[in-house]
Amino acid sequence: RPKPSSSGSWSFTYVMEPNCAKTGGVCGLYEYCPEHRRQEKGLCGENWSNQGVECCSGIPLNVKDCRTRGGQCTSKCGNAPFDEEPTCPEGEKCCFYE
């Protein structure tokens, strides 16, 4: 849900809504969901859709925090998928374990 950023302004990351979650998605700002990950419109409910929030089959691109993305910061990921984009301490990657 909307939360204050470090600058004090409000930002939106994502929210779980049942209809979207059933498709494996999360509700996030439509503009931050890559085109190939956009789900059917309206799965997040009318109230959210009116605010530019739609169902995305991945974590929206504006979410940079590793834990929020479902990962864990560590220096070695082994064979696990990883992302160097989210915020992790220097020398660590955001690893996604099952």
Curated annotation (Swiss-Prot):
Keywords, in A-Z order: Disulfide bond, Secreted, Signal, Toxin
GO molecular function, one term: toxin activity
Keyword Translocase tagged: no
GO CC list: extracellular region
Tissue expression per record: Expressed by the venom gland.
Post-translational modification: Contains 6 disulfide bonds.
Domain of life: Eukaryota
Compartment annotation: Secreted
Signal peptide range in chain numbering: 1-7
Entry similarity comment: Belongs to the scoloptoxin-19 family.
Protein name as catalogued: U-scoloptoxin(19)-Tl1a
Organism: Thereuopoda longicornis
Taxonomy of the source species: Eukaryota, Metazoa, Ecdysozoa, Arthropoda, Myriapoda
